[in-house]
Each structure stands twice: as C-alpha cells, then as structure tokens.
Amino acid sequence: VLRNVDLAFANSLRRVVLSEIPTIAVDIVEVESNTSVLADEFICHRLGLIPLSAKGVDAVEYSRECEECESYCDNCSVVLRLDAKCTGDDIMHIYARDLVIVSQRKNEFVGTPVITDPEGKGCLIAKLRKGQEIRMKCIAKKGIAKEHAKWAPTAAVGFEYDPHNNLKHLDYWYENDAKTEWPISENATWEDPTDPSAPFDFNAKPKNFYFNIETVGTMEPDVCFQGSIKVLQQKLATIIGALQGDPAANGADGYVPQSPGRGEDPGYTTPFMPGGGGQSQWGGAGTSYGGGGTTPGFGQNGQW
C-alpha cells in the first residue's frame, strides 16, 4: 500500500519497477558445439530469458562502465557453462539446473539460475537425442529492461485506487447483477466502507494506491519495489545535481546508464562538429541566420 502520494508519483514508481531495476541476465553466448535440432540463435535466446538471481547485483559493475576490462570480467559479469551430451536411447532434457557457474562472483547469490518448481529442474532449454550435444559459454551481465526485456524483473505491475468501486464501472455493463459481477476488491479492507448511495466525486484525488507486483523470480516483490524508490531517488538527484552545475551528476556516478565514451562531454557530437558540445557547422547554439534563436523576418520579440 502506497499512501499520501499523488497519481503521478505512483505511476512513476510503476514505470521504474517495469523497466529500470538493475538485474542480471545472459547477454553473450559463445557456442562451442551444438548438434541439436535447434538453431544456435534459438538456444541463445532461450538462455537470455532464463531468470538469474539479482540478489547482491549492486556489487556488479555495468560492463560498459567497468575499468578492468573491455569485454567482461569477474567485476562486471558472471560466467556460466552449459555442457550436455546424450549418450542413451531416451530423450535427454536440458534444464536451467544444468547451468554451472564457473567464474568468481561478487557474492554467492548473484547469477544463480532461479529454480522454483517442486522438481528442482528450472526452465526447459532443449532436448537431445542420442549422440547430440550442446557446449556453450554464457556471460551474464548487469542491465535494465529499458535496454532489453531479458533484464525485466517483473512480468506484470499494476495498482488500483478505488477498491470499493465508487465509480460504479458496471452500471451500464453487466448481465444479471452488477455487485456480483464486480465484487469489492480485497484491498477494500484497508479502507473504511463508503456510502454506496453517495455521488462520485470526480474532483477527488486518490491518495492510497494498492500495488500488485508479479516478479519473474529474480528478486522478491518488496525488494523490487524498494529498489524502484532507490532508482527514482537517484534519477532525481542526478537532475538536481545537473541543475546546480555539478559535473558528477552527468551520469558519472556509476549507476545511471550512459553511452560509452561520453564521459564529461557537455553535449552530443554531430557529423558537422566532431568535437562534441552540441554544436553544428554553423557554430554555437544559434543558427546560420544569427544567434539567439531568431529567424529572418522576426525581431527579438517575435514580431514582424
């Protein structure tokens, strides 16, 4: 339950939960051998979508910001191996449990395949017949869902703010009984009952929001929500720092993703001015017709 905030803030947290919580997922796959009926890219795609534990992921650096390597290392990645060969007559099933971590991790949790089924098998990766084998090296890296959906920590995120159905959504859309077909939400226990005969206040602003977060297993829902608050705080701190002229706020705090090689560049590089700074071949922030953003035919006040 999120209380005493407005709708915009609640929706901001929802968007952050969906796309900006750091997790870890298989990003690079080196195929050494694959004689199964599945194509290399098919298996690689399945490996990328296997949930890996994000517990302690803050200790892992973003690969693009790692100063110890150019591709991957123990500081910015977790290496897993998949080695399987069918030698019997029966079909061999390859599961997420068959992924073996071979690198030195930052902690004992991050990068571990998430297995929640009672049999302890995990996601099915492929099937092999006699004589077929798969040998692959998987490099898992840190990222967010804005870059690729494989880093998404959640499958669905939603919230409601009218558990008693004061808006009466089904007044004109029901078959037999509106109350039966639109039952009161279980979240209504958090609020006092309302007068069903009272008119709906369309100017009222909701203050209580009831979140429903379904994760893919990489982290717990409460941890995911707390992480969204942290991410939103850091994003706001970056904006405030930039407005105050703090050069360290330009995404250089090791958390906000930035383009490789940008560094402290004050602006974007264009084909007309490789030196960066947001300039063009016509110079400065103005135009070829003069500074100050004016155009021919207009004066300083936008008058003819």
Describe the function of each predicted region.
Residues 1-304:
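Protein-protein interaction/assembly regions in multi-subunit complexes
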